[in-house]
Amino acid sequence: MKILRNYLNNVKPSFVGEGRYSKWFPLFDAIENLFFSYTKKTKNPIHVRDAIDIQKVMVTVWLATFPAMFFGMYNVGANSLEYLDSINQQNTGDWHHYLISIVGYDSNSFFSKLWFGACYFLPIYFVVFTVGIAWEALFAIVRKHEINEGAFVSTVLFSLSCPPDLPLWQAAMGISFGLVIGKEIFGGTGKNFLNPALTGRAFLYFAYPAQISGDKVWVAGISDYNIIPEGYSGATALGVAAESGMSGITNSYTWMDAFLGNIPGSVGETSIIAILIGLIILLVTKVASWRIVAGTLVGMILMSSLLNIAGSDTNPMFAIPWYWHAVIGSFAFGLVFMATEPVSGSGTNTGRYIYGFVIGITVILIRVINPAFPEGMMLAILFANLLAPVIDHLVVMANVKKRKALFNE
């Protein structure tokens, strides 16, 4: 590394100031920070000194996704190999086969399941990451500022929220829309009012619904063979609930299956225990706000309980209790990694409770009341993103009035 450090020091003058390659400084700066810690220090005494910076925050979130990522790859392999065994096939029927065949299709092997899932997830992540960094670099060069690490988080969250069979070109389009429309046109990292990963996923959901919803996209291989053997279902637990309520869920899965993640779904959204590990990391490092988490849980429990009491003879979703809502769909993943994003969420402490409460109520209303969207977490968070500035404004104004009243007394 000393050789690389010396080389970067030697060529750095060409990239800074009026150097020959100064317009490419954002790329040089990104490469330097990739291999070496940020060395600039603020010496002026008026600045607050802290060991944390944007780079460390983004890396912490990125690492916090690893438990969900690795379990997700294993779960994709387990579900897909089970499906292939049920139709007596040992070939995915597409280009993934050439990668999977390196290890084989052994449904009894842990590593085989992990490798199978990796062969589906990693290409998606590679394409999303490459396209995302390319957009980040392009805007950094045009605006002449450093490349922020925000793309690291947006790309991994977007990839984990996708089904394993998502076409690579759609993955590229989704992250492009999310980063460009959801973040860069508003000024980049720190200035976006919508979560970029969710913005990209929402674009895919409405533009290409066949590839990101339904019963055939959550288990890799079903879309290739288009064969559903008798007694087999590739539907998610939330999809089953929307069709037949609690009886359908309990006949297909146990609560523990959903908690551990042994169910079909998006790559990173199935295992609640893996997501909770990530939540602990984010809370301990104070990257995520526990107030948003608490507000969302209270809102979700309250609204689902009210709908349980109200009941419905025609809508089976009314009967789903809160503890099932918490472990199915993308509720946990969205809460931990999307709702707690500090940029697009509320910034005041009181506002964070309200912001989370709005998400909790909205996700249940969309899931239960709206038959077109059995999964409501994505839309609930985006809706709360739009309200976050208003919430903070009202909280600040209320505090101003309170202080004025105290002063006048």
Question: What are the residue ranges of the model-derived segments?
Answer:
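N-terminal signal-anchor module of multipass membrane proteins
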Residues: 1-121, 125
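Hydrophobic alpha-helical transmembrane segments
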Residues: 58-69, 122-131, 268-284
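Membrane-interface helix-loop-helix junctions at boundaries between adjacent transmembrane segments
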Residues: 146-227
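Loop-to-transmembrane alpha-helix initiation sites
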Residues: 172, 193-198, 322-330, 352, ...
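Long hydrophobic alpha-helical segments that form multi-pass transmembrane helix bundles
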Residues: 190-276
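A beta-strand-loop signature enriched in Asp, Gly, Thr, and Trp
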Residues: 293-349
